Design a protein with these regions (language model features):
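Conserved short secondary-structure transition element at the edge of the structured enzyme core
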Residues: 39-43, 81-115
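Short glycine-/small-residue-rich flexible loop motifs, especially phosphate/cofactor-binding loops
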Residues: 35, 99, 129
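Flexible C-terminal active-site loop/helix
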Residues: 107-142
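Catalytic alpha/beta core domains of metabolic enzymes, predominantly
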Residues: 1-81, 87, 91
Length: 143
C-alpha cells in the first residue's frame, strides 16, 4: 500500500496520514467540498465523485494551489461547493444528476444510473438545469 483516500471530514486526518506515511506514500483528499483544505493539509491529490461534472474547475483549483493564489482558490472552492449543493439537492441520486448535466453541457448521452441508485425524476429537471447553468457560469468566471 502506497496511499490512502481520506473521506472523513476533519482535514487534520489528512495531516496525520501524511505525517505517518512520509514522502513515499500519498494521501488523497476525498470530500470534494474541502479539496482546497485537504490539499493544504498534505493531500497529494484528490479522488472525488463530482470531478466528472466539472473537471476543469478542479484542475483550475489545483493550479491555483500550486501557484499559491489562495484567495482565488478559496473563491473557486466556494463556487464549487455551491454547485455540489445543487447536484445533491435532487430526489434522484447525485450521479444521475451529473449524467444529465453532462448531457446538457457536453452533449454526452450516458443513460441513467443503475439500481439501487435512484434515477433522476421529471421533478428533478429544474435542479439539473440549475446545476448545468451554475457550472457554465463558474467556468466563465474562473477559466
Amino acid at each position: 500500500v502506497i496511499g490512502v483516500k481520506n473521506s472523513s471530514m476533519p482535514v487534520q486526518d489528512i495531516q496525520t496520514f501524511a505525517s505517518l506515511g512520509g514522502d513515499d506514500h500519498i494521501v488523497f483528499n476525498g470530500p470534494d467540498e474541502q479539496f482546497l483544505g485537504g490539499r493544504l493539509m498534505g493531500a497529494g491529490a484528490g479522488i472525488g465523485g463530482t470531478y466528472g461534472a466539472m473537471p476543469e474547475l478542479f484542475l483550475k483549483l489545483n493550479q491555483l494551489i500550486a501557484e499559491k493564489d489562495l484567495e482565488t482558490a478559496r473563491a473557486l472552492q466556494f463556487a464549487i461547493n455551491g454547485i455540489i449543493g445543487v447536484l445533491t439537492s435532487a430526489h434522484g441520486n447525485m450521479y444521475g444528476v451529473i449524467k444529465e448535466v453532462l448531457r446538457i453541457n457536453e452533449g454526452l448521452e450516458l443513460g441513467s444510473v443503475r439500481s439501487p441508485l435512484t434515477p433522476v425524476t421529471e421533478a428533478d429537471q429544474e435542479v439539473v438545469q440549475k446545476a448545468a447553468s451554475l457550472i457554465r457560469e463558474v467556468k466563465e468566471r474562473f477559466l
